[in-house]
Each structure stands twice: as C-alpha cells, then as structure tokens.
Amino acid sequence: MVGPSGESMPRNFKPETIALHGGQEPDPTTTSRAVPLYQTTSYVFKDTDHAARLFGLQEFGNIYTRLMNPTTDVLEKRVAALEGGVAALATASGQSAEMLALLNIVEAGQEIVASSSLYGGTYNLLHYTFPKLGIKVHFVDQSDPENFRKASNDKTRAFYAETLGNPKLDTLDIAAVSKVAKEVGVPLVIDNTMPSPYLVNPLKHGADIVVHSLTKFLGGHGTSIGGIIIDGGSFNWGNGKFKNFTEPDPSYHGLKFWEVFGKFEPFGGVNIAFILKARVQGLRDLGPAISPFNAWQILQGVETLPLRMERHSGNALKVAEFLQKHPKIEWVNYPGLSTDKNYATAKKYHERGLFGAIVGFEIKGGVEKAKKFIDGLELFSLLANIGDAKSLAIHPASTTHQQLTGPEQISAGVTPGFVRLSVGLENIDDILVDLEEALKNI
C-alpha cells in the first residue's frame, strides 16, 4: 500500500490503516518493515543523461535532500492520503509551510484576505512580514463568510483561515467560505493543525490547499519541528489570475507549470501544478527543508494519530465540562460543548463527534489570577506548544500573542485572563485533580 502521487492504493483504506501503512511498501533491498531513515544529503545519478533529466523535470527522482528525500517522501504521501489530497510537500516548520504555500500563489502587488482569528505567529507573518514583500493582507471576521468577499478586489489571490482559530477555537464554515472563494476565483488555503486530518478534512468541504504544523498532533510527542502543505488538486490555476502558473518559468527554460502539470498523465492525469511548483521553485530557492530525522520521528507519531486524537478529545471534553461548572471560571471555549456558540458548525465538520484537545477559558480576576493559576499547575507544563501527548498550558496574552496590540488580541480571542490548555493523554482523574488544586489557590 502506498499513497498519492501516482502510487496505487489497491483498497479504499480507512484513516486508521492509512496512518500505519500509507505511502510505503517494505524496502525492496533490505525488506525492512519500518520506514528506513535516509540520513543523506544527496543521491548518485545513473549517468549524466539521468542527472540532466532529473534537473530538467523530465523525470522525477532524488537529487538533493533540500528538494526531496525517501524518508520524507513517505511522510508526504501518508499525510496527503490522510487529508485526501493528490500530493504533499513537507517543510522545516509549520510557519515555513504556510509561508511557502502562500508565496507559491501570491506575488508583490497582490493581496490576501485572511481570517483575523489566527495563531500569533501566523498573524505576525501576514501583518508585518508579507507587506515588506509587497503583499497586502486584509483581516476579516470569519463568522460571516461574506466578509471575505467584501474585502476582495481584483488584486486578491488567496483566502486564508484556520479550521479552528488558535486560540479562540471559533470554527470556520469551510464550505461557505469555499463558495465565496470559488466565486471570487481564488484558492482557499486552510491551516488544519488544530483538529488534525483524523478529525476534519477541509479538502472534502471545498478547501483547495491545506497546511499543518507537523510539530503538533501529527508528530504528537513534542520532539520534532516540521510542517506540510497538501494539494487538493482541485484549483484551476489557468483561470487568468495566476500568471506565475501559466507564463514560462525562465529558470526551467520556459516551462509552464499549469500547461505541463495541470493534468499530469504520469500521475494518473491529476493536477499537481501547485505542489510541484512549491517544491521546485519555493523549496529550491527559499530552502526550508525538513530534516530526514525529523520526518522519520514525525512518522512514528502519525502511526498513532487516530488513537491519540480519540483520547485527547475524550479528556478535553471532560476538562471543558469541569471548567464550565467551576465558580472561578468566567466562560469556556470548547467546540464539543453543546452550549458552545460554535457547536453546530463544529459538529458539521467534526464528523466523528470528536472535537480535539484544545480548551480555552477565562479566569475571573484577569491576568494576575490567570498567571497564578498557571504557576500553580504541576501536571501541566507551561510551554509554547500544543499537540503533545503531555498536557500543556499557556497564557497567550503574555506569550504567543504578546506582540499583538490590545485590539488585535481581542480580535484573535485573547483576553487578559484567557488560558489555553492542550489536554494530554494522562489519566483524566489526574488531570482534573491538577486543575482543581491550581484553582483552589487563586
């Protein structure tokens, strides 16, 4: 069994099986069952003609690990299969994945419409760095999909949002925003890190491109940094708005990505124009390649993704229910609570009835009480990550979203007493005792 990118998948396997087998056949030389770690920089060509064909994109194969690697290739195929995409590109971090995905589409003088409910690092990238590259970003309230249309103009080239806003946990109506994107004629790019592909598949609901921080739930153990871009193969890059796909690329002697790879017969006639351009232009020139070792470690995490997400979700729901009843808590955000304002939308997209590991809540008394609560936790670790097997806690206003202004923080759902938990896999009784003890002392 292997995954996307032209390899046959003889049966329509379920996600639990894909997580273990996708993208791989046992190594034909060594017969190794586990995915081998190819810790190498480069690869021997058969002869000079073979090398020339590879460099000219007349044949696909390994050239240099900045562009591709056999271990990383398995990871890419496996995650693409989990998301229902045609192909994927792994990168050095989630931040580099979203950067490459957007720069593969948008050029200087063009614009992006993005949700304002974003991870702080993403907001900084779009708000501060992209304008330095000549790219303007309009931030909108995603609760009304029409806001994306209202902020669009003839320079708009992409819509960007997160499935679940981090840390606000507002659920994007993917299908509704996708409808607007299609009418405007631009791709919808979705960060699906928070729910993982086991809980939500944005491509199924109309997204065109999906990105992940592999560091989080796909890796799952807080050991390795990585990111990934998944191409749904659904977008028409030849609609007249994307000259970077339809005009000749001088660095490949006039090759036109849409013309050659928009319906690529060696891959079964699928559209791989976006993901191939991201690899052979963006990754080639900007260079944020994932290390083979990190790819190998993340693969170990992917194998247990379904099991972990079920436990994460079960524990998080119990935590949310506990906090909702506690007298020292002002309010709780968790899309799995039937009382949550996002519950109906979340239920529409979380088809398994599982809503992930992240719980947000406001402690009565504001910032000082929130800090005292976090400092009183013993089982939870205070650190800037989510998706670890261990339970984590953070105060976003003073950390992940510190560089935002007050109004920007509020727009992102970050209030002074707001705490974000990434609920781990520990015994739920131990988790609840730790929370109760910390709350007693504030």
UniProtKB/Swiss-Prot annotation:
Modification type N6-(pyridoxal phosphate)lysine: residues: 216
Q: Broadest EC class? A: transferase
Pathway(s) where this gene product acts:
Amino-acid biosynthesis; L-methionine biosynthesis via de novo pathway; L-homocysteine from O-acetyl-L-homoserine: step 1/1
What cofactor does this chain's UniProt record say it requires?
A: pyridoxal 5'-phosphate
GO cellular component labels: cytoplasm
- Is Mitochondrion a UniProt keyword of this protein? no
**Which family is annotated?**
Belongs to the trans-sulfuration enzymes family.
Function statement = Catalyzes the conversion of O-acetyl-L-homoserine (OAH) into homocysteine in the methionine biosynthesis pathway. Can also use O-succinyl-homoserine (OSH), although at low efficiency.
Q: What is this protein called?
A: O-acetyl-L-homoserine sulfhydrylase
Q: Which organism is it from?
A: Leptospira meyeri
